[in-house]
Amino acid sequence: MQKITVLCVGKLKEAFYEQAVKEYEKRLSRCCKLELLELPEQRPGDEPSEAEIRQALKKEAALVEQKLPKGGALIAMCIEGQELSSVALSQKMQQLAARGASQLTFLIGSSFGLDEDLKKKADLRLSMSPMTFPHHLARVMLLEQIYRAYQIEAGTKYHK
């Protein structure tokens, strides 16, 4: 069974997001070994400068580096990433597994995004949409898409 790690910078605060995450955790438990990791968001202040934002992202990146699993493939969720259909994501996950990536790590940054060096280390940069979403909602959307990818691979009726 493939291992999926979803590493998120920032804690879920709203109960409705937590409920949705729990639902997809339950569904995914039949498809993969899922690990959800949360790291604290660095808050640079109310009206931070670009330099303060970069510094906060560097601090977050250092925390992320400590928690990144060894081996496997790293998928950075970022707005400038590649947009894939659900079917294409399923195929990409299968391709990575076929190339020996027994573990996939999806990385969701804080409200300021991800440090550039982390993005460069990624095997794939993935964008959900050209639209902007709260990173808490992105977590739910990503879990749903991972679940959908497994259902596509299995040929179930979930994906229509």
Language-model segments: which ranges?
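Short glycine-rich anion-binding loops that position phosphate/pyrophosphate groups of nucleotides
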Residues: 12, 79-82, 110-113
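Structured adenosyl-cofactor binding patch, chiefly the S-adenosyl-L-methionine
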Residues: 112, 116-160
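Conserved strand-to-helix beginnings and helix N-cap segments that scaffold or border functional pockets
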Residues: 17-21, 86-90, 119, 139
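S-adenosyl-L-methionine/SAH cofactor-binding core of RNA-modifying enzymes
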Residues: 34, 40-102
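Short hydrophobic segments within beta-strands
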Residues: 7-9, 37-39, 77, 107
